[in-house]
Amino acid sequence: MMRLACASPPSYGESAEQGSAGESLRPETALATARATPGKALAVPNDPALPGCALLHQSELRTKVTSRLLANWLGPNEQLLESSAVPWRYVPGKRCNFQLELVIAPAPGAAVECRRVIGKLYAKDHGAKVYRMLQDFRSHGFARGRFLVPQPLAYDAQWKLLLLTWAEGELLRSLLLGDSDVSERIEEAAGWLLKLHQCGVTRGPRLTFRRHLQTLAQQKQRVGEVYPESDGLLEDLLRRIEGRGVALSGWTSRPTHRDFSPDHLVFNGGHLTALDFDEFRHYDPMFDVAHFMAHLRLLGLRNSGAMTRFDDEAERFRVAYQAGAREYSAARLRLYQAVAHFKLAYILAVVVKPPAWKEAVDAFLGEARQVL
């Protein structure tokens, strides 16, 4: 059989946030992004904790499994001829995201077509939960119209494999770094988030502030191990975050993305698709607002050395969100800004360690202290 390859994708999809040197700024190991260097060999994980890793290494098995799972998505006369898998994000022992390129014969005698879907491999059954969550979102207004989520195509319990539709378009991150006017895009991002918080989805896992504090305490310990000079400030911040959070309790949990950032928003014409719902929980909606604003700070720092580069965009986002919010708290926003800056300090110190990482950690911890 003649081998056919899909064309290289433009800058869209679930790429990990990249710094100027291309390293991941998330607590994960990035194997590739939607803009991987042409011709560069990409490492393919062989993780015994991920049953589906075999599908990344065995082409015939992958094509057979994919063909079965996508039988309802493919047309009645369509045949999947072959497939290729390009990993781009890997969390050892937890999950691996990859681009699945499909070569399809639409009908006997017709020219073959190339299509893409998203594949996600999990260690446990979290993919089944994500599948159900996306179904819930789509039944609550995210299947059509201006604001969207990917369509979940299939989940296989044996391989712990989730398949999703590919999101065409441009990442907000790319638009921001392109120095174009993104004012309307920023407001649309706020609109998507408002719709999520108000969509009425009730099913899914829940997060408490106490559990969130436990995660921060673990991150504090890890940062202290590699940067002991920061331990006193970390301890003080954690104590102040706890006190402020207890004082501001009483909020109502809503559906929250919990990883809402410019890396997970894809624009295509009049549509905006949000990606990556692995961290979804019912939680305080103000956390999503603060998380997005903090990641604009990170984007500015890592790509221009100026943490404040996108502060105008962050303020535009906040104002747009507040204008449409049914319930808004400036005090809780400041609390979660401190939390988000605390987390980013952890990522920079423990996960990424870019050049001058201590200065970057100090900057984010300083921001956390300032907003509390």
PLM ranges: what are they?
Residues R26-S83:
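Juxta-kinase regulatory segment immediately upstream of eukaryotic protein kinase catalytic domains
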Residues L56-A71, E113-W159, L175-L196:
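A conserved alpha-helical element in kinase catalytic cores
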Residues L61-V86, V201-R258, A323-A325:
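An alpha-helical support segment within catalytic cores of ATP-dependent transferases
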Residues V86-G109, K160-L163, E242-F287:
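Active-site acidic catalytic loop and adjacent metal/ATP-binding pocket
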Residues A157-V182, K195-T202, L216-E229, L298-L299, ...:
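A glycine-centered beta->alpha junction motif in the catalytic cores
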Residues F287-A325, V339-A356:
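Active-site activation/catalytic loop segments of kinase-like enzymes and analogous catalytic loops
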Residues R326-A338:
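All-alpha amphipathic helical-bundle segments outside canonical DNA-binding/catalytic cores
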